[in-house]
């Protein structure tokens, strides 16, 4: 007779400190995984409030250089984005808004995702997809997403602009999402996902008047290596600052 395999409730709950509990029933498996940075967070850094993000340069100069560049050097936008990230990091909840980074190729948008966002929040919890991937039928990767980064995005590239606009608005703001995996029934689960759109196009998203779902950073027209020629050599310093 084969070994007995107990049933367990499988969830993704970033707000819970419980992980895998298979000692006593009811059995429970939480798919959320804290990163090493979350587990070893320093308590000696002074508390910052909205309006003081610029003082972070004292502690993370290279990270701030990269963020300021991809945000088009907008002072207000940097302040708001840092606050947005901090809220997600501290609360693991949806913000109900998305960010759009626009600029010429080589501004460092991808570097930010791979060198800062993914290490801080977890590789599995920060999937990066193209628009075509979002439109495909199966989206199991969204089950454990704190962020979805949409690369080279332009809404006009969709076969049906209106349908895609409605779909994105729904996903940015709705507290639940429908997960579709191969050979299983679709299920509706709580959504913890926040969206970042990366694009080289200035007309990436059609924003209707009064729509407050999108934060749009000033467009960056200069490559990162042009404005900061020595930055690539400092990538190790960026990760050391986290």
Identify the meaning behind each predicted range.
Residues 154-155, 200-204, 220-225:
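Conserved nucleotide-binding/hydrolysis micro-motifs of P-loop NTPases
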Residues 189-192, 207-242:
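Phosphate-sensing "switch" segment of ASCE/P-loop ATPases
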Residues 146-172, 204-211:
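Conserved AAA+/SF3 P-loop NTPase catalytic/coupling segment centered on the Walker-B
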Residues 163-188:
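Conserved catalytic/switch belt of AAA+ P-loop NTPases
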Residues 154, 175-179, 196-201:
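Conserved catalytic/coupling elements of P-loop NTPase cores
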Residues 20-153, 162-164, 215-218:
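P-loop NTPase catalytic core of nucleic-acid-dependent motor ATPases
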Residues 1-29:
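Long, basic/Gly/Ser/Thr-rich N-terminal segments
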Residues 138-143, 180-198:
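AAA+/SF3 P-loop NTPase mechanochemical coupling elements
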């Amino acid at each position: 007779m084969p070994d007995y395999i107990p049933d367990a409730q499988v969830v993704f709950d970033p707000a819970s400190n419980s992980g895998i509990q298979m000692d006593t029933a009811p059995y429970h498996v939480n798919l959320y995984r804290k990163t090493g940075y979350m587990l070893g967070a320093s308590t000696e850094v002074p508390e910052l409030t909205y309006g003081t993000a610029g003082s972070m340069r004292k502690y993370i100069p290279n990270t701030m250089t990269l963020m300021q560049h991809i945000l088009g050097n907008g002072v207000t936008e940097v302040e708001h984005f840092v606050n947005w990230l901090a809220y997600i990091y501290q609360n693991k909840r949806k913000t109900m808004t998305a960010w759009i980074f626009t600029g010429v190729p080589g501004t460092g948008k991808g570097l930010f995702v791979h060198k800062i966002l993914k290490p801080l929040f977890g590789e599995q919890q920060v999937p990066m997809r193209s628009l075509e991937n979002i439109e495909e039928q199966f989206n199991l990767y969204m089950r454990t997403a704190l962020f979805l980064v949409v690369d080279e995005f332009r809404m006009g590239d969709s076969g049906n602009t209106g349908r895609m606009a409605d779909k994105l608005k729904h996903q940015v703001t709705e507290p639940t999402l429908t997960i579709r995996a191969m050979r299983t029934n679709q299920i509706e689960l709580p959504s913890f996902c926040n969206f970042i759109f990366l694009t080289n196009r200035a007309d990436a998203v059609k924003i209707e008047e009064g729509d407050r779902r999108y934060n749009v950073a000033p467009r960056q027209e200069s490559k990162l290596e042009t404005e900061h020629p020595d930055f690539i050599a400092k990538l190790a310093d960026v990760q050391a600052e986290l």
